[in-house]
Amino acid sequence: MIKKTSGTEIRALARHIGMSAQKARRVIDQIRGCSYEQTLMILELMPYRACYPIFKLVYSAAANASHNRGLKEADLFISKAEVNEGVIVKRLKPRARGRSYPIKRPTCHITIVLSERPNFNFKNI
């Protein structure tokens, strides 16, 4: 995993995850804009195979935020989450009479960006 930071955003990137981008987007669309705790609950309860690598990536991004920036995990939310298509791993499956059929295994790249929620002070309003 490659981790990049810029400004107040914490970015985590997982590359070459062995699933199609369409199946990963189905999960990413559910967690975009949610808080960190709510995201972990959603990912634990969803029955899809894509949840586990996304769970690990969100957990890693939050650990980077608390360790490198000293941010509280309760104040974090997912400001940006995207899934891009990776390379297609091509294999050959042996078939009858010396033939072979191609097997195309898609991969994807998942990017999670965490930001800190702004704290509003209502005493000054």
Swiss-Prot record:
Q: Which Pfam families match?
A: Ribosomal_L22
Q: Name one GO cellular component term.
A: chloroplast
User: Which InterPro entries does the annotation name?
Assistant: Ribosomal_uL22, Ribosomal_uL22_bac/chlpt-type, Ribosomal_uL22_bac/org-type, Ribosomal_uL22_CS, Ribosomal_uL22_sf
Instruction: List, in alphabetical order, the Gene Ontology terms for molecular function in this entry.
Output: rRNA binding; structural constituent of ribosome
Q: Provide the GO biological process annotations.
A: translation
What are the protein's UniProt keywords?
Chloroplast, Plastid, Ribonucleoprotein, Ribosomal protein, RNA-binding, rRNA-binding
Q: Where in the cell is it found?
A: Plastid, Chloroplast
Function, please? This protein binds specifically to 23S rRNA.
Question: Subunit notes for this chain?
Answer: Part of the 50S ribosomal subunit.
Q: Which family does it belong to?
A: Belongs to the universal ribosomal protein uL22 family.
Q: Which NCBIfam families match?
A: rplV_bact (TIGR01044)
What is the protein name given in its UniProt record?
Large ribosomal subunit protein uL22c
Organism (species): Nymphaea alba (White water-lily)
Lineage, highest ranks first: Eukaryota, Viridiplantae, Streptophyta, Embryophyta, Tracheophyta
